[in-house]
Amino acid sequence: MAAPKSTATRARRGRRVVKKNVTQGHAYIKSTFNNTIVSITDPKGHVISWASSGQVGFKGSRKSTPFAAQLAAESAARKAMEHGMKKVDVFVKGPGSGRETAIRSLSTAGLEVGTIADVTPQPHNGCRPPKRRRV
């Protein structure tokens, strides 16, 4: 006969948080019309920390505000500084409203901003854009 299952809860097995010692890296800010996502990586491209407007606690149309982008960038910067990050090069993508605010809040959080590059993809007359909104 099979042994009865124990009712004791088992400890959750997950990835152990490894503290990396990375002093400089890249910060990628993707700012769309609906959300802002900030990812901070080491120079090889491995993600150290990330945050988005939705993860910080905003829902719906408030995710697209500059204030939500500011809090997301501060959250990502704080997590990265726990791993020893001091200097970042910033790559900004997208047309959203949180671009400049996110860059500013990275520097006010304590990270030294090196270069700032706009890597927004520009189509060579690719896909047809969505139709204009009539409000």
UniProtKB/Swiss-Prot annotation:
One of its GO terms (molecular function) is rRNA binding. InterPro entries: Ribosomal_uS11, Ribosomal_uS11_bac-type, Ribosomal_uS11_CS, Ribosomal_uS11_sf. Keywords: Ribonucleoprotein, Ribosomal protein, RNA-binding, rRNA-binding. One of its GO terms (cellular component) is ribonucleoprotein complex. One of its GO terms (biological process) is translation. It comes from the Bacteria. SUPFAM superfamilies: Translational machinery components. Belongs to the universal ribosomal protein uS11 family. Part of the 30S ribosomal subunit. Interacts with proteins S7 and S18. Binds to IF-3. Located on the platform of the 30S subunit, it bridges several disparate RNA helices of the 16S rRNA. Forms part of the Shine-Dalgarno cleft in the 70S ribosome. This is Small ribosomal subunit protein uS11.
